[in-house]
Amino acid sequence: MIHGKTLEAWQQSHPIIAELVALKPTSWFNPGIAKAAEALHDVGLTAADVQAASARLLRFAPYLATVFPETAAAGGVIESPVIPLPQLRRVLVEEGSLQNAGSLWLKADSDLPISGSIKARGGIHEVLKHAEDLALAAGLITPTDDYTKLASDQARAFFSQYTIAVGSTGNLGLSIGIMSAKLGFQVSVHMSSDARQWKKDKLRANGVTVVEHASDYSVAVEQGRQQAASDPRCYFVDDENSPQLFLGYAVAAERLARQFDQAGIQVNADHPLFVYLPCGVGGGPGGVAFGLKLVFGDAVHCIFAEPTHSPCMLLGVYTGLHDETSVQDFGIDNITAADGLAVGRPSGFVGKAMQRLIDGYYTVADEELYRLMVIAHEQDKVKLEPSALAGVPGMLRVLQAGEYLARQGFTPTQLQQATHLVWGTGGSMVPDDEFNTYLAKGRSLQANV
């Protein structure tokens, strides 16, 4: 029995579950979405909260430019470019015989400085918020000070009295670990069995304590939570429920709007924006989607992408069970090459807060991620890790979803003028030998097609 029903009963009441359990690539577009003006109230956070996070990141920019020289050229602002993907677009259009396809772009968070993934947004913001709270309370700084003061030996000695803990499949651990250690904190990163060895090695090289767990993501998070509960000076970054992570991700939207302006890309009712966000536990894509809805309203359509073996958010929202269920409850193994998305139980906070704001969800097979990685690398010259490719098939899924397009009332002209944005969540820091192994796998899969 699964939550009081047999699997057969679930498949009858929720037919898509049969496809999920069979590990088939699946799409589901939520008929229950609402207008942004109404549904944004579900979140419990506001535009003012996002502005506060944005202002905090600017206060810390001089500090970041000082301690991370790779951010100096951008003045300590951690941001990524928007890059066209003409070859991937051509492949998707040909494969799907797509009409009125619009343009395809990459938001290259894979190239973000410091930790090379989307987690450099939320993770670094939350660590900086905690550091700021402690430093203000201790009188080390005032809000109007130059925060480069925090690069001093005195500040590092102060922060070294405190510990930060987090559970992660990899990328969040990298961003939390590197940032916390740079400030002077003691750091423990609890890593799930899915975490790549190079990510653990990089953390240890930065002076971070890595605690390895033989179980999956949810266990790693729980271990981090328990560590913090037993130590009053230990702060736990809760990837499943953190508003500060969420707000750090949300800041991306106002910056994206400026990049679109500079590139001459319009976003309005006649020029819709579709954004494809790889989803693990949900904090990163949820936060970005919240920011996008605040900035672009009903002109933006956010779609979450998950591995066929880890469809936790789709399952949670579709059944209405949210974090009360896991993919394992339904016999799905949560084992995927998309290590950053290997999450069996979704964030209840994100699922409930965002369910009326996310247009749809789809799953993608590992083999497809590898195949697309080769095209992205060889033809569009972008380096993305497997998880980051999950957003690429999104344009195909949306434009083949006739019922969804009809329900939304899109005209051929609107679709022709649409912008499709793949959120490239990570990849630049993958070691060359590991990346070449991925490419070899992708090429062998191409050869067998």
UniProtKB/Swiss-Prot annotation:
GO BP annotation list: D-serine catabolic process; isoleucine biosynthetic process
Top-level taxon in the UniProt lineage: Bacteria
UniProt-listed Enzyme Commission number(s): 4.3.1.18
GO MF, one example: D-serine ammonia-lyase activity
PROSITE patterns in the record: DEHYDRATASE_SER_THR
Modified residues (N6-(pyridoxal phosphate)lysine): K119
Catalytic activities: D-serine = pyruvate + NH4(+)
Cofactors required: pyridoxal 5'-phosphate
Pfam families membership: PALP (PF00291)
Keywords: Lyase, Pyridoxal phosphate
Record-linked NCBIfam families: D_Ser_am_lyase, PRK02991.1
Family: Belongs to the serine/threonine dehydratase family. DsdA subfamily.
Protein name per UniProt: Probable D-serine dehydratase
Record lineage: Bacteria, Pseudomonadati, Pseudomonadota, Gammaproteobacteria, Pseudomonadales
Gene that encodes the chain: dsdA
